[in-house]
Amino acid sequence: MANRIKKGDQVVVNAGKDKGKQGEVVRVDGDRVVVANVNIVKRHTKPNPQAGVAGGVVEREASIHISNVNVLNPASGKGERVGFKVLEDGRKLRVFRSSGEALDA
């Protein structure tokens, strides 16, 4: 099944502690997404000299459930729901549900 949200999409968080924040999708892992500079958590890491990792407290982005983000519509400046439209040649095209405007070129 095709995902409604893809890597590189600009999204808006619509639930949780970071509600209202915008960012770019860095990674999609099944039903979870990692958004740049959103849901920052502190991880306590052990030093690993072989990998060149210094130990300590590291801040990084944690994943968010895909249902808690909406794709940013550049026309309206708001996060909106995305659906699919099947073209005559059988390809699926992502479209905004509110306007029917195509998301992909």
Curated annotation (Swiss-Prot):
It comes from the Bacteria. This is Large ribosomal subunit protein uL24. GO terms for molecular function: rRNA binding; structural constituent of ribosome. One of two assembly initiator proteins, it binds directly to the 5'-end of the 23S rRNA, where it nucleates assembly of the 50S subunit. One of the proteins that surrounds the polypeptide exit tunnel on the outside of the subunit. GO terms for biological process: translation. Keywords: Ribonucleoprotein, Ribosomal protein, RNA-binding, rRNA-binding. Belongs to the universal ribosomal protein uL24 family. The gene is rplX. One of its GO terms (cellular component) is ribosome. It holds the Pfam family KOW. HAMAP family: Ribosomal_uL24_B. InterPro entries: KOW (IPR005824), Rib_uL2_dom2 (IPR014722), Ribosomal_uL24 (IPR003256), Ribosomal_uL24_KOW (IPR041988), Translation_prot_SH3-like_sf (IPR008991). NCBIfam families: rplX_bact (TIGR01079). The keyword Transmembrane helix does not apply. Part of the 50S ribosomal subunit.
